[in-house]
UniProtKB/Swiss-Prot annotation:
Subunit structure, interactors included: Homodimer. Interacts with BrxC.
GO cellular component terms attached to this protein's record: cytosol
Taxonomic placement: Bacteria, Bacillati, Bacillota, Bacilli, Bacillales
UniProt source species: Bacillus subtilis (strain 168)
NCBIfam families for the chain: PRK10792.1, PRK14186.1
Similarity-based family: Belongs to the tetrahydrofolate dehydrogenase/cyclohydrolase family.
Protein name listed in UniProt: Bifunctional protein FolD
Amino acid sequence: MTATIIDGKETAREKREQLAKEVEELKKQGVTPGLAVILIGDDPASHSYVRGKKKAAETMGMNFKLDQFDSSLTEAELLSIIDQYNQDPEFHGILVQLPLPDHISEKAVIERISPDKDVDGFHPLNVGKMLLGEDTFLPCTPHGIVELLKKTNIDLSGKEVVVVGRSNIVGKPVGQLLLNENATVTYCHSRTENITEHTKKADILVVAVGRANFISADQIKEGAVVIDVGVNRLENGKLCGDVEFEGAKEKASFITPVPGGVGPMTITMLAHNTVKSAKRTLS
C-alpha cells in the first residue's frame, strides 16, 4: 500500500479562496477584517512565520498591521500595546508571535488579549469553550488538522486516535477537538512507556513532538491515517517531519507531507478566526 498524500496546500488554497469571498462581502457592509501582529526579537523562524501570515492576510484582502520590537521591550510595555489593540475597532484579531523573550510571561500576554480578539485560540476562556464543545476561536493548527482529516471523508466517530505530544498549542487541543468528534483519544508523551504499543493501535496517528523522524514505519498500524505536525531542519538543510515519511507512506492509507501538509492550514485557520471575529461585530 502506498498512502494517499493529504495535500495541505490545496486544501488551504480552497479555504483561502472562500475566505477572500467572505472578506469581500464584509467590506460591502463596511467592515474590513483586521489582524494586528506583535513580533518581539530576532528569531528567524518567528520572522518567517509572520511573513507568511502577512502574505496570506493581504492576499485575502484583510487589513494587516505588524508591530516589531527588539528584545528589550518590557512586559508592561507589551501589555499596554495589547490594551490599545483590545480597544481598537479596526482590528478584529490580535496575535503575539511566540516564543517570547524570557523576561515576558507568556501566560500574562495570552490572558491580556481580549477573548473576543484571541484569534490564536489560546485564551483560557476560549480553551474552556472548546472543552465544552461551544462555538469559539479554535487553536489554528489543531483546527487545521481536523479540517484536513475531514477532507479524507473518514468518519472520525469511534476511531482510535493516538496523539504523540501534549503541548498546549497542538497536542492537548487536537486531542480535545477529535474527542468532540466522538473519536477515542489516547495521549502519548515523553513519560509514556512502550509508546509503540499505543501508536500501533491508532487508526489515526497525530505526531507533534518537534523531533526529526521520531516515529518510524514499524510503529504505525497498517492502513492508519498519519498526521505529521513537526517541522524540523536536518543538518543538510532539508525540512522533515516527526514521522519517517518514506517508510510511513508505504504503511499508511493517508499521510501529510512536510512541508505542504499541516503548515499551510495553520495560517489559513488564523485568517478564518479573524474573519469570524469581524463577522461578530455585525451581529
